[in-house]
Amino acid sequence: MKWITREKIKVDRVACPWLIKKFIDPDAEFVFLPRSTDWTKISDGIVFDVPDCELGHHGEDVSFNSIMKKYNLTDPALMLLGEIVRAADSHPAGAGLRWVASGFGALGLSDHEILEREFIVYDALYAECRRQTGS
């Protein structure tokens, strides 16, 4: 399936593709479009983490949380990771995650290269969240 979001990815737009590939759609293809895209006109894929979409920010939830809810992902370790993604500025591990995301952006890589390189960070975070939650 094709999954579509905004270009210039950071925390949530790296975490979401990681979540999608690992737990929802291992064959997912990601497309990154400009912020100015009219998201309501896209019909050839699943739109996420853009304004006014089902798999976007709602209340205190970030797109990662919305995707977890939509696909009934209830693993305690994923729930903890969702808290870290949501609170990238306030959770003890969140500030570091924001710095990592900003650092990858500063390397001048394409969004696809950032996904390829940064997925290992989310693999490690998920492993630690599993350890922390005993799941």
Model-flagged regions — what are they?
Residues 1-4, 11, 45, 99-110:
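Generic alpha-helix detector with strongest preference for long hydrophobic helices that associate
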Residues 2-6, 12-78:
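Conserved, aromatic- and glycine-enriched, well-ordered alpha/beta core segments
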Residues 70-135:
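A charged, amphipathic interaction segment
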